[in-house]
Amino acid sequence: MRVLFAAAECAPMVKVGGMGDVVASLPSALAKLGHDVRLIIPGYSKLWGLLDISKDPIYTAQTMGAEFSVYETKHPTSNLPIYLVGHPVFDPERIYGGEDEDWRFTFFASATAEFAWNVWKPQVLHCHDWHTGMIPVWMHQDPEISTVFTIHNLKYQGPWRWKLERMTWCPWYMSGDHTMAAAMLFADRVNAVSPTYSREIRTSEYGESLEGLLNYISGKLRGILNGIDLDEWDPATDKALPANFSSGKMSTRKKNKEALQRQMGLEVNNDKYLLGMVGRLVDQKGVDLLLQVSRRLLAYTDSQIVVLGTGDQILESALWELAIDHPGRFAVFLTYDDYLSRLIYAGSDAFLMPSRFEPCGISQLLAMRYGSIPIVRNVGGLVDTVIPHDPINKSGTGFCFDRFEPIDFYTALVRSWEAFRHRRSWKELQKRAMTQMYSWERSAMEYETMYKEVSGYKEPSPDAIEVEKFSVGQDADPSLKNEKLSVGQDEDSSLKNERFI
């Protein structure tokens, strides 16, 4: 089966969140099942220094009043074909943000649609998050191309309908308040990145005002758990680690803990309880909860805490204050570093993920793979992947709490600290966590089943009257009434992309 992945990220070259890992690893697993899988991403300027890219474009065309060129290259690890949409708008050293973000990704989606129609026609076009959300709308008119839309994070929903109409062609049949809503309505299948998250987003607590729409499309909504590349992330062979280890040979793991403590300026002592955190430093990840409980935890236990990541400046500053107030106990490194992240997974005793919401989460899978016990909130994909520790029955893989409250998180931390005192049972807990097999192969087979369901099939158009019931609406900003939301767009450019009308 011919499958084209369209996304804003692809690890390791372009990665901000978990989507980059999915777009890199899932196609490789699908290719091993015998499918012809290719990727298309924006041609970010930094890629020309990282990849061997064709000198001349393989396709040049116009859309949304601007010219684009498509270049071909290969993924550095999977060797799968990657197509890069080239345009000066992708030149700055950024992936997200900027005043032109809405235009930039809508342009990428439009260029991808033109490429799929005219150059390499897939049977399934797999779109990821709002950046590619208009593609299912346009492909709704093409019976030969089916679409799958994956929700990685429902919070980010793309430009509203009024803005889309001034940037690009919105077909007469299109409905939905914004890009994310339109994608969910017109994709032939929609999936969230874990079974629990697919249920949560149908509720008001996690639905981001889209719960009504998600219940309306529930018949085509799926939940498929993310995985990890077990070869790429293997503590027995990972060359980045000071000492390799496995579930059958744990004795050398302590060398990684000592190396981590030394590098982060902590007291080098294997008996200290070392907690790690890697990721975006934002409210979603529960960094504010960590800030509220850290001083008490450090005062009443012998714990050490290491934090790696970037994000909200207020949270970063608060973490710095903690590090200054607790030298040798609390360390923070405000950047992303692959080597250091691996060292935290391999050297920490436990891994912190007190998330407000978590579509799937990959960090907890990597932590378990490397023997760091996850301490998580029971939400989203964390529910599907972390089994609560039961010392009596000697089962479970981590520590879980329910409410997003400091006292609940603190209680889970103290429970884990007490469990760490019992070294023999703690090692058994580590071994159970390390032997969990959340590979992409299992997930790929579920995606394959979904592709077969939709190949050659188009979902009926949504009922516009029913959809209107779920509209939350947003009026156009009067100050933008005469603004042109494109690069070199003339007044009638929204008509230039019309097809099959």
Curated annotation (Swiss-Prot):
Catalytic activity, EC: 2.4.1.21
GO BP term, example: glycogen biosynthetic process
Alphabetized Pfam families for the sequence: Glyco_transf_5, Glycos_transf_1
InterPro entries, sorted: Glyco_trans_1, GS/SS, Starch_synth_cat_dom
GO molecular function terms listed in the Swiss-Prot or TrEMBL record: alpha-1,4-glucan glucosyltransferase (ADP-glucose donor) activity; alpha-1,4-glucan glucosyltransferase (UDP-glucose donor) activity
Catalysed reaction equations from the record: [(1->4)-alpha-D-glucosyl](n) + ADP-alpha-D-glucose = [(1->4)-alpha-D-glucosyl](n+1) + ADP + H(+)
Pathway: Glycan biosynthesis; glycogen biosynthesis
Binding site for ADP-alpha-D-glucose: K15
Stretches the record annotates as Disordered: 476-501
Keywords for this protein: Glycogen biosynthesis, Glycosyltransferase, Transferase
Gene3D superfamilies from the UniProt entry: Glycogen Phosphorylase B (3.40.50.2000)
Family: Belongs to the glycosyltransferase 1 family. Bacterial/plant glycogen synthase subfamily.
Cited function: Synthesizes alpha-1,4-glucan chains using ADP-glucose.
Annotated protein name in UniProt: Glycogen synthase
